[in-house]
Swiss-Prot record:
One of its GO terms (molecular function) is flavin prenyltransferase activity. Pfam families: Flavoprotein. It catalyses: dimethylallyl phosphate + FMNH2 = prenylated FMNH2 + phosphate. Flavin prenyltransferase that catalyzes the synthesis of the prenylated FMN cofactor (prenyl-FMN) for 4-hydroxy-3-polyprenylbenzoic acid decarboxylase UbiD. The prenyltransferase is metal-independent and links a dimethylallyl moiety from dimethylallyl monophosphate (DMAP) to the flavin N5 and C6 atoms of FMN. Its EC number is 2.5.1.129. Dimethylallyl phosphate binds at Y156, K172. Belongs to the UbiX/PAD1 family. The keyword Membrane does not apply. This is Flavin prenyltransferase UbiX. FMN binds at G10, A11, S12, S36, S91, T92, N93, T94, R126. Keywords: Flavoprotein, FMN, Prenyltransferase, Transferase. The keyword tRNA processing does not apply. It comes from Aquifex aeolicus (strain VF5).
Length: 189
């Protein structure tokens, strides 16, 4: 079973992280999950859910505490065995910390370790509009080998619901790591 690390921050759009978690479970990945304190607040605010409710029934998920720097995810010698690391959604604070090597919590540490060990790192940055600092930090991440994905759904697949739009973005996240899926119709041209 392949491993994925998924970090969910407190940016608006926690639903992207939840959907990615559910799809990875369906695709039989083992997921190591780090949920920030603010992500729990946002989930409650945006969807009236708790993470306990979201995690119910998921078998291949291992939870790591946001401030546990002894987690195996904090170690490069362990993280190299992962298919990749997702930070979904990624707050601009988390983007800044990862881009500048500041480790305030396990999510920041996992991002930094992924970059230093060349483990694929994918950040779904959820902010609008971007300012110069955001763009510079995205450029830093990209230059270090990470991939920054905007939370921007397309419309060529003619979405009929919010779920269709979420599926498109999550599908793009999976595409970055070359994970097969059927979440949206591909462009036919």
């Amino acid at each position: 079973m392949q491993k994925i690390a998924l970090c969910i921050t407190g940016a608006s759009g926690v639903i992207y992280g939840i959907k990615l978690l559910q799809v990875l479970e369906e695709l039989d990945f083992s997921v190591d999950l780090v949920i920030s304190r603010n992500a729990k607040v946002v989930l409650k605010e945006e969807h009236s859910l708790t993470f306990e409710e979201v995690l119910k029934g998921l078998k291949n998920v291992r939870i790591h505490e946001e401030n546990d720097f002894t987690s195996p995810l904090a170690s490069g010698s362990r993280l190299v065995h992962y298919r990749g690391v997702y930070v979904v959604p990624c707050s601009t604070n988390t983007l800044s910390c990862i881009a500048n090597g500041i480790n305030k919590n396990l999510i920041h540490r996992v991002g930094e370790v992924a970059l230093k060990e060349r483990v694929p790192l994918v950040l779904l940055v959820r902010e609008a509009p971007y300012n110069e600092i955001h763009l510079e930090n995205m450029l830093k991440i990209t230059r270090m080998g990470g991939v920054v994905v905007p939370a921007s759904p397309a419309f060529y697949h003619k979405p009929q619901s919010i779920d269709d739009m979420i599926n498109f973005v999550v599908g793009k996240l999976l595409d970055v790591l070359r994970i097969e899926h059927n979440l949206y119709k591909r462009w036919r041209g």
